[in-house]
Amino acid sequence: MTANTKTHAMPDMKPQTTLDLNGLASPGPLPALRRTLRTVEEGQVLLLISDFPGIENDLHVWAKQTNHQVLFIDRTRPRGFGFFILKGDLWPVERSVDVTGSHCPTPVLEASKTMVQIRAGQNIKLVSDCQAAPLEVNTWIKTTGHKLLAMTEDSRGVYRFYIKK
């Protein structure tokens, strides 16, 4: 039997701000992270360095609740992990469609319904964890004439598609 493994090399990301909170005691890095993010613009990346126990799960829950995204986790640091966090959205969006937990073709079907509700030139954000979503969204874009502005994928495989009508 052969093990199926993926190697995730560190992407070429340039954070606008770095926040080193190694050694920080309770309540942990989230309050300091919130304060620092106030100085970061929408669509920019912050690098949080932390060795706080349980921070990875806390960050993912916090990011989902606050419309941020944990893009990548650098686990190669000598002390603590490096969390690359995208603040907010890359583009202004008129509507958000979150179909996380739904199987394909649900993302494209829901995006189609939402596009009917917005005007030409406006954007939607489609959030999906379906592994086939990138392929399906690209095919859908080509057949509908909409424009894919960007796609991001977080460290847990959740995609954000920014689509212009």
Locate each region found by the language model.
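Domain-level signature for proteins that mediate thiol-based redox and metal-cofactor handling
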Residues: 2-165
